[in-house]
Amino acid sequence: SPAFNSWG
């Protein structure tokens, strides 16, 4: 998830 990480 973009809200949690930069790759997913």
Swiss-Prot record:
Positions of modified residues (Glycine amide): G8
Family: Belongs to the kinin family.
Job of this protein: Mediates visceral muscle contractile activity (myotropic activity).
Subcellular location: Secreted
Transferase as UniProt keyword: no
GO terms (BP aspect): neuropeptide signaling pathway
Keywords annotated in UniProt: Amidation, Neuropeptide, Secreted
GO cellular component, one term: extracellular region
Record has RNA-binding as a keyword: no
Name assigned to this protein: Kinin-5
Superkingdom of origin organism: Eukaryota
